[in-house]
């Protein structure tokens, strides 16, 4: 069974509905003591990094998520949820993240943008992916739906499994062992997004 983490900052119903479209039952779970009962966790998120970490902290979820990760069960972060997997973010100050993937989250460097580009990065864009179980059955290059003003920088480029170009190339999907994340919204990305969610439901950690 897959749990969608409810920390009062996310598009929980739309994520759950997306899983329902592929025939997968999920539970919206707000009790961190129950996380260990599930096979997989989804960490969604919409909003500011610092607020999200505070919500997780208030609910006692930070250690529960870290313990789940240490058990080698799969975790998928979506949009802000992916960013929370990193060590820190510079969004509205410096904020500590979950530290499950080494690296940080930074603002788009608009000095590298053409005049026509704006922040946030919003709309359909291509993701170029490495071979990974999340992308099985998808082309190496496929369109997904993005809404974000900050992006991840991986300390280890091996953790970057998806790249997208918006003014410059940035990491749009990550994976380190059982920890995975995607910056775009699969629940808004039609068939390509549903395929990623389906692949996550089938994912089996190798450890």
Curated annotation (Swiss-Prot):
NCBIfam families, alphabetized: IMP_synth_hisH
MF (Gene Ontology): glutaminase activity; imidazoleglycerol-phosphate synthase activity; lyase activity
Species: Sulfurimonas denitrificans (strain ATCC 33889 / DSM 1251) (Thiomicrospira denitrificans (strain ATCC 33889 / DSM 1251))
Subunit structure: Heterodimer of HisH and HisF.
Listed EC numbers: 4.3.2.10, 3.5.1.2
Reaction equation(s) it catalyzes: 5-[(5-phospho-1-deoxy-D-ribulos-1-ylimino)methylamino]-1-(5-phospho-beta-D-ribosyl)imidazole-4-carboxamide + L-glutamine = D-erythro-1-(imidazol-4-yl)glycerol 3-phosphate + 5-amino-1-(5-phospho-beta-D-ribosyl)imidazole-4-carboxamide + L-glutamate + H(+); L-glutamine + H2O = L-glutamate + NH4(+)
Protein's UniProt name: Imidazole glycerol phosphate synthase subunit HisH
Localization in the cell: Cytoplasm
Pathway membership, UniProt: Amino-acid biosynthesis; L-histidine biosynthesis; L-histidine from 5-phospho-alpha-D-ribose 1-diphosphate: step 5/9
